A protein has these predicted regions:
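Short, conserved beta-strand edge motifs with alternating hydrophobic and charged residues
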Residues: 3-5, 44-47, 81-82
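Short basic alpha-helical hairpin corresponding to helix-turn-helix/winged-helix-like nucleic-acid-binding
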Residues: 23-30, 42
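Helix-rich interaction surfaces within compact, conserved domain-sized segments
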Residues: 2-7, 96-146
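Conserved catalytic cores of phosphodiester-cleaving nucleases, focusing on short active-site segments
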Residues: 33-52
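Short, basic, glycine/proline-bearing loop/turn elements
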Residues: 14-20, 46-54
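Mg2+/Mn2+-dependent nuclease catalytic core
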Residues: 48-74
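Nucleic-acid nuclease catalytic cores
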Residues: 69-99
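Acidic-basic catalytic patches of nuclease active cores, encompassing PD-(D/E)XK
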Residues: 1-25
């Protein structure tokens, strides 16, 4: 079971007619978008979107990376699901692969990664409907850890 983690906000303006929040600010830093367990394995992941073939690492915050590293130290599995909107493709970014890009940037290298640098076997198969079929790809990630 995977649940969406609510992002804590403080409303500033509320449209009285529709009761919709029109302006708000974040109360605190959020960790990940989703958390739960799959077949007894703790899972957390964050969803990101990219409309080009270059993903800026500034879209991922250090506190998220630290949270995910600590999550994996507790025998969980952490990853990012990235939607490459211009290509209509989803990618499962393993935390280990992200850390390669992250450490490269920390050492003065590129502060982004390119589509071509990604592992082809972690692109998600197309599916009908609105669901993102990441479970089979997560199994590949787990198999690489054994």
């Amino acid at each position: 079971m995977i649940q969406k983690v609510p992002t804590p906000i403080t409303p500033i303006n509320i449209d009285k007619a529709t009761r919709h929040i029109t302006l708000a600010y974040f109360d605190q830093k959020s960790t990940v978008d989703y958390i739960g367990a799959v077949q007894g394995i703790p899972v957390c992941f964050d969803a990101k979107e990219c409309n080009t073939d270059t993903f800026p690492l500034q879209n991922i915050h250090e506190h998220q990376v630290v949270f995910m590293e600590n999550f994996e130290k507790q025998r969980g599995i952490a990853f990012f699901l990235i939607s490459f909107t211009a290509r209509d493709e989803f990618y499962y970014l393993r935390l280990a692969k992200l850390l390669e890009f992250w450490n490269r940037a920390k050492e003065g290298g590129r502060k982004s990664f390119r589509y071509e640098e990604l592992e082809p076997e972690f692109f998600l198969p197309k599916s009908r409907g609105v669901l993102v079929p990441y479970l089979d790809t997560m199994q590949k990630d787990l198999a690489m850890r054994d």
